[in-house]
């Protein structure tokens, strides 16, 4: 079983490192194009997106793995049970994301004033970011389904598609001189939006014509399991990204410029975060599918030991 975990970690890991490294090449690219204050807008927005994604996915990713395993344990028509689970979790997250976007788009002017002077002249930034979040949430459960099915290569291929498209568009916009126009940094969000939308359209081909449809009885059970995960996820995400907001609101002068510098420097820690990410992508469905096996405790202990050893080596 540990061999399977190691294999999936390697698949997720090599591809994740390559894709994320390509994505992080945008950091020196953007810092050469934009001034410190302008790049501060990028840092600010991309610190808020993970919080919105955590809130709107509601812990349903992990719940999907858990209840998929329960469907297999229960026997019967496992395929129908998993299809019902997928339709329910996908449906509720899609609905939540749609409502979120409508609210954000409707109140974009008020939100732009709340976020600071840098956004007042460009409330459209809020709309573009809302659309990015919408498409990313709509893609979330289909991606979880691929992980649950062990289709690691397809998973990383689709993730790579989005990142590569984002990078290519960003470079193309820069070469075309669009970042120097009045819309400026907004083209960063447009590139991301196009990449997220294309990824969502492509991943739709993997859902086997399943229509998002909420089974309310099943949702109650799933949400009871996911609620603690949601709370923990929000706490973890806030802990990881709240420092950006503290800089934005507590630095007396030049806060956005300082935020831009800080955001660029924190990219240095990317290697450790990449290793954590690649292990989590493989470990989460693996453990939630095997936790009832007799040797699970020993297997978990061994996996954690090697994870800590590898983490110390990277450090």
Where do the model's predicted regions map?
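Interhelical loop/hinge segments that connect adjacent transmembrane helices in multipass membrane
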Residues: 1-5, 181, 185-188, 201-240, ...
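N-terminal membrane topogenesis motif
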Residues: 1-24, 80-83, 87, 153, ...
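Signature of the first transmembrane helix
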Residues: 4-65, 97, 101-105, 132, ...
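Alpha-helical transmembrane segments of multi-pass membrane transporters/permeases
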Residues: 6-19, 83-84, 126-131, 145-171, ...
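Alpha-helical transmembrane segments of multi-pass membrane transport and lipid-handling proteins
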Residues: 17, 87-115, 168-172, 276, ...
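Alpha-helical transmembrane segments of multi-pass membrane proteins
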Residues: 51, 102, 117-139, 190, ...
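Specific pore-lining/lateral-gate transmembrane helices of multi-pass inner-membrane transport
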Residues: 70-89, 261-315
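Hydrophobic alpha-helical transmembrane segments
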Residues: 127, 156-208, 232, 266-269
